[in-house]
Amino acid sequence: MGTVLSLSPSYRKATLFEDGAATVGHYTAVQNSKNAKDKNLKRHSIISVLPWKRIVAVSAKKKNSKKVQPNSSYQNNITHLNNENLKKSLSCANLSTFAQPPPAQPPAPPASQLSGSQTGVSSSVKKAPHPAVSSAGTPKRVIVQASTSELLRCLGEFLCRRCYRLKHLSPTDPVLWLRSVDRSLLLQGWQDQGFITPANVVFLYMLCRDVISSEVGSDHELQAVLLTCLYLSYSYMGNEISYPLKPFLVESCKEAFWDRCLSVINLMSSKMLQINADPHYFTQVFSDLKNESGQEDKKRLLLGLDR
């Protein structure tokens, strides 16, 4: 029974190759067949591995060749660009160093024409004088300074000379009229600070110089016209939007006051805008007001000499 069990596997193996009894030869044959199969498997694996290695090597060479080719082409492009730039630089250098020939000079005119042209030029030069060129392109800057009290005194003297019919008018009277209006507006709270300043006095003088006539017959009339000019000065130069009318009225009829205001506006509107926009005009009016005091001194001197 043990023999049968030991031979039964060999019998099954033997049937794989050929029919026959199970012997030791069959075992060797089976073993040889196994070895042959192993050899064949090894050969096939070796054969399959060798082409794979070759394929990998070939693909690596192709990749290296692809990587190398762009570098070589890039180097070729760089050398080509360098050559082109060198050619351009040489051409630019040639253009920059190129010197144009001097233009041909016209032929000299005959001596007779030359003498005639010279005499004509000299005569024309003698006839046409050179225009005078001013050294200073801008107008001369004039600086004038004066205090408020000094300008008010000049304004009072101007009014006294203008209204020559008013024999009892003093230069301080117009100043008192102006000061009283300014003080009343301060006390009533219509303004935070006094309006009587040098600039505003200059503006008032500009109005009075063209509005107040020399035919004024009374102090009351002069005061009415002067306060009308003062009201317009407040309205144009003051800090507040509006001012009360009562401090400026010296008569019961308001229509007469407004009529004077309209006439002054129609007459002096352009100059009121000019003195605010043109500093040279303001300086000129300032100088004229300051010179009013000097004119009074000259008048007194002439009266003394006549006596």
From Swiss-Prot:
It comes from the Eukaryota. The modification Phosphoserine is found at S8. p35 is a neuron specific activator of CDK5. The complex p35/CDK5 is required for neurite outgrowth and cortical lamination. Involved in dendritic spine morphogenesis by mediating the EFNA1-EPHA4 signaling. Activator of TPKII. The complex p35/CDK5 participates in the regulation of the circadian clock by modulating the function of CLOCK protein: phosphorylates CLOCK at 'Thr-451' and 'Thr-461' and regulates the transcriptional activity of the CLOCK-BMAL1 heterodimer in association with altered stability and subcellular distribution. The record marks F98, A99 as: Cleavage. The p35 form is proteolytically cleaved by calpain, giving rise to the p25 form. P35 has a 5 to 10 fold shorter half-life compared to p25. The conversion results in deregulation of the CDK5 kinase: p25/CDK5 kinase displays an increased and altered tau phosphorylation in comparison to the p35/CDK5 kinase in vivo. It comes from Bos taurus. Residues 100-110 have a biased composition (Pro residues). Brain and neuron specific. This is Cyclin-dependent kinase 5 activator 1. Belongs to the cyclin-dependent kinase 5 activator family. The modification Phosphothreonine is found at T138. GO terms for cellular component: axon; contractile muscle fiber; cyclin-dependent protein kinase holoenzyme complex; cytoplasm; dendrite; dendritic spine; growth cone; membrane. Residues 97-135 are annotated as: Disordered. One of its GO terms (molecular function) is protein serine/threonine kinase activator activity. PANTHER family: CYCLIN DEPENDANT KINASE-5 ACTIVATOR (PTHR23401), CYCLIN-DEPENDENT KINASE 5 ACTIVATOR 1 (PTHR23401:SF2). Heterodimer composed of a catalytic subunit CDK5 and a regulatory subunit CDK5R1 (p25) and macromolecular complex composed of at least CDK5, CDK5R1 (p35) and CDK5RAP1 or CDK5RAP2 or CDK5RAP3. Only the heterodimer shows kinase activity. Interacts with EPHA4 and NGEF; may mediate the activation of NGEF by EPHA4. Interacts with RASGRF2. The complex p35/CDK5 interacts with CLOCK. A lipid is attached at G2 (N-myristoyl glycine).
